[in-house]
A protein has these predicted regions:
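Generic secondary-structure boundary/loop-capping signal
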Residues: 13, 114, 149-152
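N-terminal glycine-rich anion-binding loop in soluble enzyme alpha/beta folds
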Residues: 2-3, 7-45
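Conserved hydrophobic/aromatic beta-strand scaffold that supports enzyme active sites
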Residues: 15, 84-86, 170-172
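A residue-level signal for conserved active-site and pocket-lining positions in enzyme catalytic cores
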Residues: 15, 76, 131
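Active-site histidine-anchored catalytic micro-motif
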Residues: 8-9, 33-40, 45-56, 60, ...
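Anionic-ligand-binding alpha/beta catalytic cores of soluble enzymes and soluble regulatory domains
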Residues: 120-173
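Residues that form generic nucleotide/phosphate-binding pockets
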Residues: 29, 61, 134
């Protein structure tokens, strides 16, 4: 299996906000193990646990990045811990919690590959940094991680068209 490697950019999207240490701790952990990567912030102002808004922002942003970029989209509710996924889709890598976010980003499309990086999100900063190192080092990901056949799937909200109205949800303003 051939993978697209040599990512130039790591794009970050989260619900961390900018008021505490979490974002800087994530960036420092990534750079400590991967000093040659370039970090780009997409957004860290997603409302807490809002998977729909995170998916909307991520799915609209990632196509602007060069092939082989790594996208970390971390919007996570501790009570729903099913682990960490690594997906390859449209020539880009996605690292995110297994909480349905991947299915919302990809909508009706299926990623080429999905790997389960970890069964839990404990120490996620270190795990994410390690996954990035494997990708940057051009290692065979299928030898390092098990395929994930059953990621959590969530369905995007679609508008309902009626004779005199359209009913939908606003996910981003």
């Amino acid at each position: 299996m051939t993978y697209i490697h040599k990512p130039q950019l790591i794009a970050l999207c989260s619900d961390f906000g900018n008021k505490d240490f979490r974002l800087s701790a994530l960036k420092a952990t990534i750079l400590k193990e991967n000093p040659t990567v370039n970090l780009v912030d997409i957004s860290h102002e997603i409302p807490s646990f809002d998977l729909v808004q995170a998916a909307f922002i991520q799915s609209n942003a990632f196509r602007s990045f060069p092939e082989g970029s790594i996208h970390i989209c971390w919007v996570f509710n501790v009570g729903e811990d099913r682990g960490i996924l690594l997906a390859l889709w449209e020539g880009q890598f996605f690292i995110l919690p297994d909480n349905g976010l991947l299915s919302l980003i990809c909508d009706q499309y299926k990623p080429e590959k999905i790997f389960r990086v970890s069964d839990d999100c404990f120490r996620f900063r270190e795990r994410i940094s390690s996954v990035i190192k494997h990708i940057v080092s051009e290692e065979d990901l299928s030898e390092l991680f098990d395929p994930c056949e059953d990621p959590i799937v969530k369905i995007n909200v679609s508008p309902v068209y009626q004779k005199d109205r359209i009913q939908s949800r606003v996910c981003f303003v």
